[in-house]
Amino acid sequence: MKKYISILLVSFATSAVFVSCEDSIDKENKPIPYEPIGGYENSDEVAAAHLVSKFSFDGTIDDSKNGITGGTGTNVSYDAGIKGSAYKGSTSSFIAYDNVASSVVNLKSITVSMWIKTDQHTGGAQSLFMLPKKTDFWGNIFSLIESGSSNTSMFLKNHIQRDVTPSIDWSGQFVEHNGDNILKNMYGSWKQIVWSYNGTSSTYSIYVDGQKIVLPVSISKRYASDPTKGGGPFGELASSEVSKFIIGGYQQHLGAPWGAPDGWMLNYTGLMDEFRIYDVALTDNEVSALYKLEKDKR
């Protein structure tokens, strides 16, 4: 009898341990809620009301916000991105879009965010994107990467069209990151670049991997004093004669009414992912949250 009771006790104890293990496994396998970052659960929540264009390049060239549509890809392919797949550039690749919505055309302030993975190049400047202008060689807005002599730095040049009268040509009003302000350690790995222009304060900011770059006043307030307006600020953006949009090339790659590209005008050869345009200048917290969320594939 004692032996029988002992066997029962052992059997009961074994069953209890097994059930306890099952409970433990179930608890371990239950989804763990994401911790909010900067008050957001995912990247699309950041300044959601101000996101006017978004390209994730998950096997498509479409803008999920439909701010820029009618895309035609030339030699477009994809590779692994920071989040899903990414646009893979080459010496002959670009994407041309035929339709640009008023939400993009009429931007007064702007933030452009993108992830890029690229290598050093020579021979000219690679265009990341461009908002063309029919009668202006430089277009309305663009970002490009100049060739450089260092494998750890990037010479980024941004051009933004200003609110001007027809008699004044502000072509060539570049923000240039070179010399002491060159962007360092940019090649060979994924980097998030975010730049913004605040039309209210006429100030420019740039961030790399969620961190704001400290810029001299000559750059951050590049547009704070307009000599043609008695030293007043340049003010809000004023894109005009907008026709089409291009990723990975220049407006000159689109044909008429633009001429053929100059020899230094190079297609972007790196990877690009999560390209976004906002109609406001994002705050430091918003940029930091966007970086962390996208890096976390959220």
Regions found by a protein language model. Give the residues of each.
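C-terminal motif of bacterial Sec signal peptides marking the signal peptidase cleavage site
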Residues: 16-20
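Extracellular glycan-associated modules
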Residues: 22-69, 82-298
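Sec-dependent N-terminal signal peptides
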Residues: 6-11
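Small-residue (G/S/T/A) turn/hinge positions that recur once per unit in extracellular repeat modules
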Residues: 74-76, 80
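Generic low-complexity, intrinsically disordered sequence content enriched
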Residues: 12-13, 217
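Positively charged n-region of N-terminal signal peptides that target proteins for export
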Residues: 1-4
